[in-house]
Amino acid sequence: MQVTFLGTSSGVPTLNRNVSAMVLKPPQRSELWLFDCGEGTQHQFIRSNLKLSQIKKIFITHMHGDHIYGLPGLLASIGLAGSSSGIELYGPAPLKNFIDSCLYNSSSRLAYSLKFHRVENAANNKEILFEDSELEVKTAPLKHRIPSFAYRVNQKTRPGRFDIEKAKLKGIPPGPVYADLQRGEEVRLEDGRIFSGKEFCGPPRPGVSMVYCTDTVYTESAIEISRKADLLIHESTYSYKETEMAYERGHSTATMAAQIAAKANVDQLILTHLSPRYTPGNQTCPNDLLNEAKAIFPNTQLAKDFLQIDLNKS
């Protein structure tokens, strides 16, 4: 599982940080999942090694402009390229009307399908939002000025590593039967012998998990959805010096993000959604927010545009 940051500023873009967008590349798949789509996101795709044509799912946290203004243009560009078979969009209830209105009023026609999924019920009832044989996505309500939602992607436990040499020593011929054994299934060979895949596989391999949590002030819901995640990506709009402003505007300080990471017992925290006021050279700079968080949760990193993180378990 690979994460790429395309926008790490809050509110407005800066010279070095675009507004919110993050891409997840699911393991063993030639597809991309986009989380939020602030203005200029498609430009960030061009500057990266990612392809718009590979986007299959888009997850929107909330309907503030710095998280959605890039979406109509991005969808239209994908349509012009003619390389998409369809995209599924997950987000708050107003998302569909926003996209439909933009496309209608700009006379844009997409040559592919859009399927919208409202997330409120899954978030409030703690239901799984999406699931297939390898991955599941959960969502949870956050605490912001408008409805906002966190997303968690879990890779399911995988079969243990298949010992090819052991299978060969048992006289099992290579072929499709190896795939059956790797899945732990019982197989019968043409000579009548029966083997269980458990004989040739190591212990099951746990999957990795990622949580994307923005925009929100400190809330227990963020802790709950983040528990024992391998990676928590959490907004860090303000320094602790602006705690009062953070509560007024429904945002987190670096301290709040670190407290959530610590209480949720995550492996790694990455701070994103930084206020433009914290640019290098100002009285408070991004590294000050990083140090603020690391004082509480040492395994913290500062997001920057085009940073890539690979999540793997041995």
From Swiss-Prot:
CC cofactor: Zn(2+)
Pfam family, one: Lactamase_B
Reaction it catalyzes: Endonucleolytic cleavage of RNA, removing extra 3' nucleotides from tRNA precursor, generating 3' termini of tRNAs. A 3'-hydroxy group is left at the tRNA terminus and a 5'-phosphoryl group is left at the trailer molecule
Chain positions recorded as Zn(2+) 2 binding sites: 66-67, 215, 273
Note accompanying the cofactor annotation: Binds 2 Zn(2+) ions.
Binding-site positions, Zn(2+) 1: 62, 64, 144, 215
Similarity annotation: Belongs to the RNase Z family.
Main function: Zinc phosphodiesterase, which displays some tRNA 3'-processing endonuclease activity. Probably involved in tRNA maturation, by removing a 3'-trailer from precursor tRNA.
Oligomer and partners: Homodimer.
Name of the protein in its database record: Ribonuclease Z
Classification lineage: Bacteria, Bacillati, Cyanobacteriota, Cyanophyceae, Synechococcales
Gene: rnz
